[in-house]
């Protein structure tokens, strides 16, 4: 479930292009080598063992194995250390992602109502929207459709300062029994903060969304995108473009 708040905005997750290599921490270019080359270097074997013992999806494991096999041929090359640093940093991040970890939803409407009421007075529209979502989830569970993908709603909180936009978010997470993560937008000026940097950079890092998943060690947390109206003027348009990608129901299925 995604949440975001703003003090001044009124009501109103593009696909990654592998050819241009503006890929995030999950992205690995498709290899032209079909055969996985043998790995003999001890450091590369350690990295491969780290990947094999992790919960990284098999397709990604296979691609990383290909990269490691190619890198093994460069052990005596001057470019080896730089390439090793890149792949080691990449593997360090992808193995931290909680690929198969989710929290079990607590679909007790009475309990959820009590939690929401105990933290905030009023805000009935928000509370009813959350309870409506939980009701649909509970109904699907009773019909044996619990494992069916249910797109999480995006709630847009608009209001004056001090009306509970930020504080209601952790209450919603508690009511659902999910982990909670907050991403502050105040002063943000670079869309790469959200999208992540290309793995080809030595200091590359994933975006704040992926970092939030790593921090809470869950793939289905409630994420609050806080104070989106306070991004810098210079980066506003590009950051809002990334938000469209993240919040578009047709593109954010991986964050549900």
Spans of model-derived segments:
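Walker A/P-loop
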Residues: 146-185, 214-215
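Short loop/turn elements that form and flank the Walker-type P-loop nucleotide-binding site
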Residues: 150-153, 176, 195, 203, ...
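The Walker A (P-loop) glycine that initiates the GxxxxGKT/S ATP-binding motif of P-loop NTPases
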Residues: 157-159, 196, 227
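AAA+/P-loop NTPase substrate/partner-engagement loops
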Residues: 175-205, 212, 232
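Conserved alpha-helical scaffold flanking the Walker A/P-loop in AAA+ ATPase domains
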Residues: 200-224, 256
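Glycine/charge-rich, flexible interdomain linkers and switch-proximal surface loops
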Residues: 106-109, 113, 134, 140-163
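Extended, charged alpha-helical coiled-coil/arm scaffolds that mediate oligomerization and mechanical coupling
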Residues: 2-140
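Conserved catalytic/switch belt of AAA+ P-loop NTPases
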Residues: 225-256
């Amino acid at each position: 479930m995604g949440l975001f708040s703003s003090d001044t905005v009124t009501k109103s997750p593009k696909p990654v292009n592998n050819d241009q290599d503006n890929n995030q921490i999950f992205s690995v270019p498709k290899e032209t080598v079909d055969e996985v080359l043998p790995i003999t270097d001890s450091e590369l074997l350690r990295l491969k063992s780290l990947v094999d013992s992790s919960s990284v999806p098999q397709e990604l494991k296979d691609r990383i194995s290909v990269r490691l096999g190619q890198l093994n041929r460069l052990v005596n090359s001057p470019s080896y250390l730089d390439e090793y640093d890149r792949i080691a940093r990449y593997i360090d991040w992808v193995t931290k992602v909680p690929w198969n970890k989710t929290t079990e939803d607590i679909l007790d409407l009475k309990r959820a109502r009590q939690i929401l009421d105990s933290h905030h007075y009023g805000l009935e529209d928000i509370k009813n929207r959350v309870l409506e979502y939980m009701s649909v989830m509970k109904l699907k569970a009773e019909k044996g459709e619990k494992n069916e993908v249910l797109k999480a709603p995006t709630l847009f909180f608009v209001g004056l300062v001090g009306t509970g936009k930020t504080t209601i978010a952790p209450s919603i997470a508690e009511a659902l029994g999910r982990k909670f993560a907050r991403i502050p937008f105040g002063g943000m000026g670079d869309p790469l903060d959200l999208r992540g940097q290309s793995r080809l950079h030595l200091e590359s890092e994933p975006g704040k969304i992926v970092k939030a998943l790593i921090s809470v060690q869950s793939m289905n947390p409630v994420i609050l995108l806080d104070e989106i109206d306070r991004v810098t003027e210079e980066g506003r348009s590009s950051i809002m473009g990334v938000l469209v990608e993240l919040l578009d129901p047709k593109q954010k299925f991986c964050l549900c």
